[in-house]
Amino acid sequence: MRTIAILAAILLVALQAQAESLQERADEATTQKQSGEDNQDLAISFAGNGLSALRTSGSQARATCYCRIGHCTILESLSGVCEISGRLYRLCCR
């Protein structure tokens, strides 16, 4: 009886590990599928005085920001988080 209980416990642990692996793969697939949607991101532009060095020269800096599902592109930096319809996105600005 003990042997059956031990074998059942081992089987449950193996099934749980496999289920977690499948969930990670599903999450990765979802992330990859959504990364194609980055081109449809919401664009936000801010016009105003930029760095203090620019303020002294009288010019204005302009930032364009996107609410991205995936990571920011090479030219962008993570500037915060934005929320659209209760869902959180990365705020990436250049």
Curated annotation (Swiss-Prot):
Per the UniProt entry, the disulfide pairs are C65-C93, C67-C82, C72-C92
Q: Which GO terms describe its biological process?
A: antibacterial humoral response; antimicrobial humoral immune response mediated by antimicrobial peptide; cellular response to lipopolysaccharide; defense response to fungus; defense response to Gram-negative bacterium; defense response to Gram-positive bacterium; disruption of plasma membrane integrity in another organism; innate immune response in mucosa
Which InterPro entries would you find in this protein's record?
A: Alpha-defensin, Alpha-defensin_C, Alpha-defensin_N, Beta/alpha-defensin_C
Any single GO CC term annotated in Swiss-Prot or TrEMBL for this entry: midbody
What does the UniProt record tell us about how this protein is modified after translation? Glycosylated.
Q: What is the lineage of its organism?
A: Eukaryota, Metazoa, Chordata, Craniata, Vertebrata
Task: Indicate the secretion signal residues.
Answer: 1-19
Q: Where in the cell is it found?
A: Secreted; Cytoplasmic vesicle, Secretory vesicle
Kindly give the PROSITE patterns that the UniProt entry links to this protein.
Answer: DEFENSIN (PS00269)
Which family is it part of? Belongs to the alpha-defensin family.
Sorted alphabetically, the keyword list is: Antibiotic, Antimicrobial, Cytoplasmic vesicle, Defensin, Disulfide bond, Fungicide, Glycoprotein, Immunity, Innate immunity, Secreted, Signal
Q: What is this protein called?
A: Defensin alpha 5
Q: Quote the subunit structure annotation.
A: Homodimer. Homotetramer. Interacts with B.antracis lef/lethal factor.
Species name for this entry? Pan troglodytes
- A Pfam family of the record is Defensin_propep
